[in-house]
């Protein structure tokens, strides 16, 4: 019976690791055509409301400069001007297409991640027994470690996530999550998140050391502070 529970728990752990990837891949493919049709049939007019975006403005300014150039060369042949108008029209359609594809990409990835979160939450609730078994294994493993080893791992993880050299790692991690949700790259937002998250984690960790470790294992706190110094 215990072997069966152990196998079920390990299978549950493996499914938690691979399930998000499978859900994302499946829903991306199944929702892509629906989101594209919905956007193209009902939301195409939003383009003209969102045209204030900087990258779209920049491209249309370039087109305006071409139009000014057209005015300057009116004495040129009518055929040349007609070709110029056709080129501007094609470029405008291309800008609209790129803009719409960006919006579809954002909606698709955001929807997929929300669905993935809901499914994983329900899966975690249904697999509560397996989570309890995995938690007991983890606690037993950690309990059997010496205080020195525990302090070493705590120091390593804190330096890795909230240490002086962790900024670049946070930039990559937050940038990956930000991109995975389909949002366009924004240096100001990413910089703000990189500044906020390590501070919050550092505060929570110090509070945990003060409230929990001091009560459970004072010797571990002493070793940790000695190694940290």
From Swiss-Prot:
- Gene Ontology CC terms: chloroplast inner membrane
Described purpose of this protein according to its UniProt entry: Contributes to K(+)/H(+) antiport activity by supporting proton efflux to control proton extrusion and homeostasis in chloroplasts in a light-dependent manner to modulate photosynthesis. Prevents excessive induction of non-photochemical quenching (NPQ) under continuous-light conditions. Indirectly promotes efficient inorganic carbon uptake into chloroplasts.
Could you tell me the superkingdom of the organism this chain comes from?
A: Eukaryota
Kindly give the Pfam families that the UniProt entry links to this protein.
Answer: CemA
Gene name of the encoded protein: cemA
Protein's recorded name: Potassium/proton antiporter CemA
**Catalyzed chemical reaction(s):** K(+)(in) + H(+)(out) = K(+)(out) + H(+)(in)
Origin species? Daucus carota (Wild carrot)
The family database entries (InterPro entries) matched by this protein are listed as: CemA (IPR004282)
């Amino acid at each position: 019976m215990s072997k069966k529970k152990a196998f079920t728990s390990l299978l549950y752990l493996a499914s938690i690791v691979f399930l998000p990837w499978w859900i994302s891949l499946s829903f991306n493919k199944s929702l892509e055509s629906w989101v594209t049709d919905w956007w193209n049939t009902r939301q195409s007019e939003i383009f003209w409301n969102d045209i204030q975006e900087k990258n779209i403005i920049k491209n249309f300014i370039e087109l305006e400069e071409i139009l000014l150039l057209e005015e300057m060369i009116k004495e040129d042949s009518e055929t040349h001007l007609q070709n110029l108008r056709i080129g501007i029209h094609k470029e405008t359609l291309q800008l609209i297409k790129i803009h719409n594809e960006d919006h579809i990409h954002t909606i698709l990835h955001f929807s997929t991640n929300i669905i993935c979160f809901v499914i994983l939450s329900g899966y975690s609730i249904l697999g509560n027994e397996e989570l309890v078994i995995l938690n007991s294994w983890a606690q037993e493993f950690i309990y059997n470690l010496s205080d020195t080893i525990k302090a070493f791992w705590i120091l390593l993880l804190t330096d890795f996530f909230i240490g002086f050299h962790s900024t670049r790692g946070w930039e990559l991690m937050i940038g990956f999550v930000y991109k995975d949700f389909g949002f366009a790259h924004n240096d100001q937002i990413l910089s703000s998140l990189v500044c906020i998250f390590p501070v919050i984690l550092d505060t929570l960790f110090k509070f945990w050391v003060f409230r929990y470790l001091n009560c459970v294992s004072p010797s571990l706190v002493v070793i940790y502070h000695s190694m940290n110094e």
